[in-house]
Swiss-Prot record:
It is found in: Cytoplasm. InterPro entries: Aldolase_TIM (IPR013785), Thiazole_synthase_ThiG (IPR033983), ThiG (IPR008867). Keywords: Cytoplasm, Schiff base, Thiamine biosynthesis, Transferase. It comes from Acetivibrio thermocellus (strain ATCC 27405 / DSM 1237 / JCM 9322 / NBRC 103400 / NCIMB 10682 / NRRL B-4536 / VPI 7372) (Clostridium thermocellum). This is Thiazole synthase. Belongs to the ThiG family. Homotetramer. Forms heterodimers with either ThiH or ThiS. The gene is thiG.
């Protein structure tokens, strides 16, 4: 089965992307990455201390992973662009996850500023994956701006509430012909499986793994869930019906 995910010219086999925040200790991150099978790992640039090898988050991310810095902390397009440029200048490559958040309570993304940042960074050669509220018109604008994918939230960051925006995400999947990667709010493996069954191209998970009792085992559970959900989607889910329908004939065999 030819089922490749291509982003920015890179073939990505694992459809589970992972974040690196909130872990009880950075030293477990390599094991988490290994058990998850993830190829794409995101990290906030503000958590990278380039002057300290011990505290430098990059030390714990396997070298064969695609590093995707994010612009966490940016409150507007200007700040997001500045962080992205700093990440590339620091050797973190061209992949960038745009996060523009000016709302301190719910941490919801500012789609307008995100679109502005995407337009600028795409012109500068970045491979831009913007985190967004799942709005169809804004997703189209991000695509037109050159985004390599869109990353709609399932629920507010860090809440583990699952796919509260399920119907809106499904609209993006149906209408946008660039990858749709569900990001934020995924709280358990079944949430990730559900997103993949909907037809999402990938999911990004951080809090649900990092705050689990055993993050390494949870990473493996998420990996299995993503694979199962993708296979279910590709296989074609059976129709949902209003009334019961017997799987075997109910008449004729007692004559």
């Amino acid at each position: 089965m030819d089922d490749k995910l291509i982003i920015g010219g890179r073939e990505i086999i694992s459809r589970l992307f992972i974040g690196t925040g909130k872990f009880p200790a950075n030293r477990i991150i390599p094991d988490v990455v290994r058990m998850s099978g993830a190829q794409v790992v995101t990290v906030a640039l503000r958590r990278i201390d380039f002057d300290s090898d011990e505290e430098n988050m990059l030390r714990y991310i396997p070298k064969d992973c695609i590093l995707m810095p994010n612009t966490s902390g940016a409150r507007n397009a200007e700040e997001a662009v500045r962080i992205a440029r700093l990440a590339r200048a620091s050797g973190c490559g061209n992949f960038i996850k745009i996060e523009v958040i000016s709302d301190n309570r719910y941490l919801l993304p500012d789609n307008l500023e995100t679109i502005k940042a995407t337009e600028i960074l795409v012109k500068e050669g970045f491979i831009v994956l913007p985190y967004m509220n799942p709005d169809l018109m804004d997703a189209r604008r991000l695509k037109d701006a050159g985004a390599a994918a869109v990353m709609p939230l399932g629920a507010p960051i860090g809440t583990n509430k699952g796919l509260k925006t399920r119907e809106m995400i499904k609209i993006l999947i149906d209408e946008i012909d660039i990858p749709v990667i569900v990001d934020a709010g995924i709280g358990k493996p079944s949430d990730a499986c559900e997103a993949m069954e909907l037809g999402a191209d990938a999911v990004l998970v951080n809090t649900a793994i990092a705050t689990a009792g055993d993050p390494v085992v949870m990473a493996e559970a998420f990996a299995n869930a993503v694979i199962a959900g993708r296979k279910a989607y590709l296989s074609g889910l059976g129709p949902v019906k209003e009334y019961a329908e017997a799987s075997s004939p109910l008449t004729g065999f007692l004559r």
